[in-house]
Amino acid sequence: MPMGRFLSLVRGDSAESPREITSQSNIIGDTGSNGWLIRFFDSAFFCEWIAVSYLYKHPHAGVRDYLCNRMYTLPLSGIESYLFQICYMMVHKPSPSLDKFVIDICGKSLKIALKVHWFLLAELEDADDNEGISRIQEKCQIAATLMGEWSPLMRPQNEVSTPGSKNQVLNRLLSSKQKLFSLKLSPPTQKSLSFSPSPGTNVQDDGSQLPAEDNKIFKKLIPSPKVRDALMFRKSADKDDEESEKEGFFKRLLRDSKGEGDEPIPNSEGFFKRLLKDNKSEDEDITNSSEGFFKRLLSSKGESEELTSSSDGLFKRLLRDNKGDEEELGANSDSFFKRLLRESKNEDEESNPNSEGFFKKLFRDSKPEDDKVPKEVDDEDKDGFLKKLFREKNDDKRHGSEKNEANGTVYADKKSGEEDEREGFFKKFFKEKSDDKKDIVKVDDGNESEGDESPEFSLFKRLFRIHPEDAKPTSENENSSNGLVESSPGTENFFRKLFRDRDQSVEDSELFGSKKHKEKRPGSPKQRDDTPSGKPPLPNNTASQFRKGAYHESLEFVQALCETSYGLVDIFPIEDRKIGLRESLAEINFHLSEAEITGGICFPMGRGVFRVVHIPEDECILLNSREKAPYMISVEVLKAETPSAKESSNSQKLSKGGIPLANGDAFLQKPPPWAYPLWTTQEVYRNSADRMSLSTAQAIDQAMTPKSEVKVKLVNVSLSVEDRTSALESFGDPIDDVLGEAPRTGLNNDLEWVRVVVTADPGLRMESIPDPSVPRKKEHRRVPSTVAMEEVRAAAAKGEAPPGLPLKGAGQDSSDAQPRANGGMLKEGDALSGELWEGKRDRIRKASIYGKLPGWDLRSIIVKSGDDCRQEHLAVQLISHFYDIFQEAGLPLWLRPYEVLVTSSYTALIETIPDTASIHSIKSRYPNITSLRDFFVAKYKENSPSFKLAQRNFVESMAGYSLVCYLLQVKDRHNGNLLLDEEGHIIHIDFGFMLSNSPGGVNFESAPFKLTRELLEVMDSDADGVPSEFFDYFKVLCIQGFLTCRKHAERIILLVEMLQDSGFPCFKGGPRTIQNLRKRFHLSLTEEQCVSLVLSLISSSLDAWRTRQYDYYQRVLNGIL
């Protein structure tokens, strides 16, 4: 199937990005093989992993452009899990489309923008081309702050949000008919809208609040390209009154009225139609309330019975010399805007200074001109409204004001109060060069020669015309206006300034224009965040200020934490180091309170959007380290007030053990049924968790378990459905074998009955029943289900023996260890870390001043400096993928992914795992416990249901981490890097040595994984590997896990291969690192051979001598028990 077009994203001009590449050139090739690739990208198989992997494998620009366009349709949570690889490819495999995509997603998520900044900062410190990385980093920063679409972390305290309104001032302008759109004379004492250039918000006399920047009020009056198209092709569209209430402001503003014969209504008549309406129907009775906006405005300058002739264009009428004969109008006929624009110089006029109108302050000019005006209007409008509109730039150069041309707003900190009042709204938008007035007049004169079209329609054709590249012939009106495209430079200049979609700087073209000019085309990036949130957004100026503040304050917060860890290294002794840590945290807390004013500080880790409010100084813990000073802190956070709809709707996925998925939405999507061959559909979609081949399952059963006994059929059971009448008759029969009945209601509401008949087997004899001493069942339950886990928990709560678990251990009897354990002050139910996380959380919440606020939560992190933790981030990312692989296969192998956030090449934030303790700390705290089994017996009470459940959790986690340690060659596995949680799971941390590097450069830990005597004792085995139920369960889980990982070998290998040129210590082996990783998956072996392979790996790891010697070395050198 040939591919028609490729979508491409170009770094140069955002107005043309994404653009269509109409020439196929050599993208597809002669064979057209890439056509299948495009179909694959458009299928249901497409996900984040496919996008990232093909971005790495395919260097062709067309493929990368198409992939980046498709990535816009993927959820941000999935993209975030591969952000490390994406940023790495940005630096080492640059692509304009990839740069554009990363810049765009930085504007959609604050957490992504922060992580991109830190990832690029780490690469910036290593790379030689610092200018290119710094330029991308700056663009991402601008996209996240000035053009950000993410909701601010908090709202300003002095802002009141009104539901159903996007802007309070616009809402007031549109809804207040009496104050703004009525020609009735207002009393002198009427309260008017006041405007102030202060950066805050202004309170009206009647109590309502208004933003300060006047330009911000009208910035949305700039029509978008879609509105321009609607004006050209939908000029006379009929709309109901109900639809007019539901439609947006600009549709109601720019829509034409229903008909000229109907009675005009102010709200239903379009703004520009009233602006351009000719005075053809002079005899028609038009009331004050039905007159057009500008018609009423200009009525004081024209004749009372006729405004102008219909043949004159708009601007010619606007620029007409007002020296003509004008009749003196009385006070009752004064128009509304005439009163608003009345010169404030004359103190003896009817309106006093306190009643200055809203628009009067908008259009007020600070310096009067010396233009000559008739005496009739000298007291009313000295300079004239139109002269203010088209005032030339010569006085603007004297008062240079900095304007944000991207979104049409003027920041309060860059303008003084006099400049705010000096420049009116229309003056700013219609500001032109000195020859603009002449050009506009010439254009209007030229338009008079076109008699077929009305002057107002030709005006729209000139104003809202489409760029030649974007022009599409869809109607005869557009084809007839081809001559208007090549209009005068003055109009083109005017329009470029008004809509700012062509002549922009490089920064504007890539960042500021992307928000306005993304066009929806088939296959192009979809606007996923178009759905409005429940709360109205902030005005853009305030929102961008808050976004900018939150972005920079979050960066400074993390930098202060990391610099604290870096500075504590030089402080001795340790007691002074703890004092210095608390003093530094106190200073950080002071900055936290100040950051609340500028937008808050984002907590960059975990799910959801939270802002940091406080760090309890007394809860900080300085961790043990000889050369560095890592520390652990608890952080009080509050959930952001305006979370995105996607984050609030996504429920947190939990595993069987209650651990959230590390990858979240990044799961591989299940293809539709039609994508599979017919003979494999049922096999793929079956719900069974065991997906091994039949031969593999038979091999495991033959090696691990005895044959099951033969079942004896004792009874025959038959079911039948009868009508209510016949069922009742049979129910009355005393000679009936009905044991139970249940009513059932059919579709016709006739009552039916289900008859259950149980009869004994006539051919059964007592000799047929076997002896009760039959071989045991397969109690190891090769793939335990969630139901089985719940059975164990329920049985443990009742104090009964759970089904499917052995009652006695097959290993050594450790009953004599019970008094020693009790003597070590460890009691059943004691917390491993001294205090359970929930208890600590409740205690801190009660003591905190923020604890009663909604959305309060407590997070714990480790701040580490002095180490390059990018390798640690890669290891945790790989563990997350192994976790997802086991979850997709339905295997009970247990892993605990955690987050490592790299903030530079030598600093990082690490998520702490609550309610855990290392084996070393457990032995140190309870000196009378000499082995890990002693701890299990003391904590869970031997042979109790909780003890069996803890053993099961230990085995499932041991199997998962054993496979990970073998495949990734994780070293340095001493007891300080092995944690235990409250449920008995074992957790591995600290992945500084993996793949090809080892401690000291000597591969002393040569065993596939750590399986020492004390670990085997917990599984009811010993150093010789004596069979036991839990040890057999461990073997089966290792076999199933290894076979499942082989199916996803390319997924793991490619993820590592993407970073092989990064210079991480784990890649010091060069290309052999990837080759050896591939060999460890043994992709050439059959599944039966893999069973024998895994069993041999377990045998070689049983209490290996080198593993024991390494533990002894750590005990002697570092005191690790």
Curated annotation (Swiss-Prot):
Q: Which InterPro entries match?
A: ARM-type_fold, Kinase-like_dom_sf, PI3/4_kinase_cat_dom, PI3/4_kinase_cat_sf, PI3/4_kinase_CS, PI3K_accessory_dom, PI4KB-PIK1_PIK, PI_Kinase
UniProt entry tagged with the keyword Iron-sulfur: no
Q: Where is the composition biased (Acidic residues)?
A: 446-455
Please, one GO biological process term?
root hair cell tip growth
GO CC annotations? cytoplasmic vesicle membrane; Golgi apparatus; membrane; nucleus; plasma membrane; root hair tip
Q: List the catalytic activities from the record.
A: a 1,2-diacyl-sn-glycero-3-phospho-(1D-myo-inositol) + ATP = a 1,2-diacyl-sn-glycero-3-phospho-(1D-myo-inositol 4-phosphate) + ADP + H(+)
Query: What enzyme class is recorded for this protein?
Result: transferase
Topology in membrane? Peripheral membrane protein
Q: Could you tell me which residues belong to the region G-loop?
A: 841-847
Residue stretches of biased makeup (Basic and acidic residues): 358-376, 383-405, 412-421, 435-445, 466-475
Composition bias of kind Polar residues appears in: 187-207, 476-489
Localization per Swiss-Prot or TrEMBL: Cell membrane; Golgi apparatus, trans-Golgi network; Cytoplasmic vesicle membrane
Residues covered by the PIK helical domain: 1-143
Q: Family per UniProt? A: Belongs to the PI3/PI4-kinase family. Type III PI4K subfamily.
Q: What is known of its domains?
A: The PPC (Plant PI4K Charged) region is involved in membrane targeting and phospholipid binding.
What is the stated purpose of this protein? Acts on phosphatidylinositol (PtdIns) in the first committed step in the production of the second messenger inositol-1,4,5-trisphosphate. Necessary for proper organization of the trans-Golgi network (TGN) and post-Golgi secretion in root hairs. Together with PI4KB2, required during polarized root hair expansion and pollen tube elongation. Functions redundantly with PI4KB2 upstream of the cold response phosphoinositide-dependent phospholipase C (PI-PLC) pathway.
Subunit-structure text: Interacts with AHK2, CBL1 and RABA4D.
Name under which the protein is recorded: Phosphatidylinositol 4-kinase beta 1
Species whose genome carries this gene = Arabidopsis thaliana (Mouse-ear cress)
